[in-house]
Structure formats: structure tokens, C-alpha cells
Amino acid sequence: MRFFPILCLVLFISHGVASRRHSHSKKKKAKESSVGAVGPPSSKDFAFRLYRALVSESPGQNVFFSPLSVSMSLGMLSLGAGLKTKTQILDGLGLSLQQGQEDKLHKGFQQLLQRFRQPSDGLQLSLGSALFKDPAVHIRDDFLSAMKTLYMSDTFSTNFGNPEIAKKQINNYVAKQTKGKIVDFIKDLDSTHVMIVVNYIFFKAKWQTAFSETNTHKMDFHVTPKRTTQVPMMNREDGYSYYLDQNISCTVVGIPYQGNAIALFILPSEGKMKQVEDGLDERTLRNWLKMFTKRRLDLYLPKFSIEATYKLENVLPKLGIQDVFTTHADLSGITDHTNIKLSEMVHKSMMEVEESGTTAAAITGAIFTFRSARPSSLKIEFTRPFLLTLMEDSHILFVGKVTRP
């Protein structure tokens, strides 16, 4: 049996350098993003169902992943899947083959890739894929054509008979696409591999208004009610998008980036993490974005870096995507070889959140001013485990849980 894995790479870097070049309309648009703009029609609930599956696999650990990258990888795989396997993939994404949503899925990703390739001031966002295949294995021309046309995928001839050379070629590609942040991603490779599909998303953004390094101090973070650890805590008093969700017991704070992106930080009430996680769905997200109001907050947010790697072949079956990782999978649309099997689907993600330098913060100042006496601010401290989601326009790029900053 010959094998091929799918590798999903995610890199998120948030820098707090501020800028005044963006208009109020762009800030307002980021705040008021609706769930449903042009793009792939995969259910937003897929992001949260996958989140809950990953949490169950890693209890008490940090969680960070890109539902966009995972769904795009599954979309590419569905191009070459037979009816039963394809139906499982689409059902897992919350779509229906009978309703003609497969074409909308592929065309949606095509539109998204085209839009993400357009330069955006203050925001670096790249999404793409590549296929590395052994020249001895014939891949169907219509599959390669669809990968190129719909997913703008690069295709490389790779000598898997020499694992060291193949590993170096793929790792060099990964390092280039992630701007050197992910190196030596593939550590083990052998001659049974005949094809590797890589999907990556790279995000680097600046806050619209910076945190000042002089306001960052060590504070206690309560990992559990009985365990605390010291973490660098950023602080900025300013106007933020704010909503208190009493239905599922959490506080939501929206912090805009340049380039029409926004990060939502979700702080469950004490002892209510499970209740909040169970309540995460598309309707909840839409309600938060709709109900946001501007509120002056004295915000404390950890400066943190997290990294996660997942073997999705252990997780996706919980979402109903089962056959694709077994010998029952029908991948005849990819190759005529009957002894080729999808061996694994690895998702690696990294996230760094930090404040800007003092100079940048001093140049920027606050983006909200008040004519009358300065109103009192509400103090919100992210000093216990919290959730986050990052959106660009209506698209959920990342979802995470910070348990140990």
C-alpha cells in the first residue's frame, strides 16, 4: 500500500503597531461583519463542531486551528472522491451534495483565493496549497486541472524514493510560505509516500491601535481555580466593541486590526467554560456581531504564543468523515492506482499576540475621544482561560482556546 498525507499549516502573527491611515468606515465594517459574505458556503457551525472535537481530544490544553484551512483541504480532497466518500466530506462540512453546494464550495474558495491575493494595507493574509507527487505515480489530469483552476494549487514533481531530498523540498516550500516561521515541519518521510498535499494560511496583522509595552506587567493567570501562573499582561484603556452575553454567560470584546479583520476575545464567567463552548454556533456568532456596542474598557489581555499540531484522521470521523482515511475510501478521481490511501491529515498552527513598541503607541494615541468628562471605564481582565476567534470580513480564519498562555 502506498500512502499520501494532507498537511495543513497555519501561522497567525498579531503585531500591535498602529496606523491612522484607515478610515472610520473600514473600522465600522470590521465591527459589523456579517456571517455570510461571498466565499465558500461551508457551514460556520463546522468551525465550532471541529473546535469541540479538538477540545475533547486535548482536555485542559491550548487549542488553535484554522477551520478555513481544514475545510479548504477537505474541499480539494472532495474533487477526487467518489460518491460515498464525497457525500461524507460534504456532510461533515455541513453541506449537501443534493442541493448543488459542491460547485458553490469550490467556486467560493476560488473567489476567496483571488480576493486574498489582492494587497491590503497593514494586513498580510495568504492562503494557498501545493501538491507534491512522485513522477512514478499517475495523477488524473482533470484532478490536477481542477486543483490549479479552483484552488490555484502549485504542483511539484518530488522524488519520494529519496526521502531526504523529498523532505528538504517540501520543508523549504513550507518555510518560504510561512515566512520562515515553520521550519523542518516534516521530520519523518519514507518511500511508501507517493504524494503530499500542503495547505497553508499565513496571517500577520497590526492592531488599529497599539498596546504600549510600558503598560505590560506580570500578572497572575488562573489556569485552574487552584493553579496560577505569572504571564505578561498587556493593558490599554480605550473604546472597544463589547457585549455581555447573558444567555451563555460570557463577555465578548472585539479588537479591530487594520485591513478589515477583527479578533473576538470571549471570556466565560467563572465556572461557565463548558456552557460557553456548548453554546458556540453560527447564530451565537451572528448575535455577537449584531449586538456589539462601543464601551470604554480598561482591558487586560495576555501577551502569548501558542502552537498546536493535530492528526485530523483521529478527529474528523467524529464529524462523520470516516471512510476517507480507510481502505474503503473511493479516491478514483485522483488516481487510477487502487493501492494508494490517504494516510494522515496533519494540521499545524502557530499564534503570537503581542503589543507594539513604545514609539508606535505614543504616535498613535487613542482612537476615541470624548467631548465631555471622561466616562468611567469597565475593567475586564482575561486572567483565566478564554476563547478567541479571528475573522476577516465574514470568514472565520481561526478559532482558539487559551488555557495556558
From Swiss-Prot:
Not detected in blood plasma (at protein level). Expressed in testis, epididymis, seminal vesicles, prostate and ovaries. It comes from Mus musculus (Mouse). Residues 1-19 form the signal peptide. CDD domains: serpinA5_PCI. The lineage of its organism: Eukaryota, Metazoa, Chordata, Craniata, Vertebrata. Its main location: secreted. GO terms for biological process: spermatogenesis. SMART domains: SERPIN. Residues 20-24 form a propeptide. This is Plasma serine protease inhibitor. Its inhibitory activity is greatly enhanced in the presence of glycosaminoglycans, heparin, thrombomodulin and phospholipids vesicles.
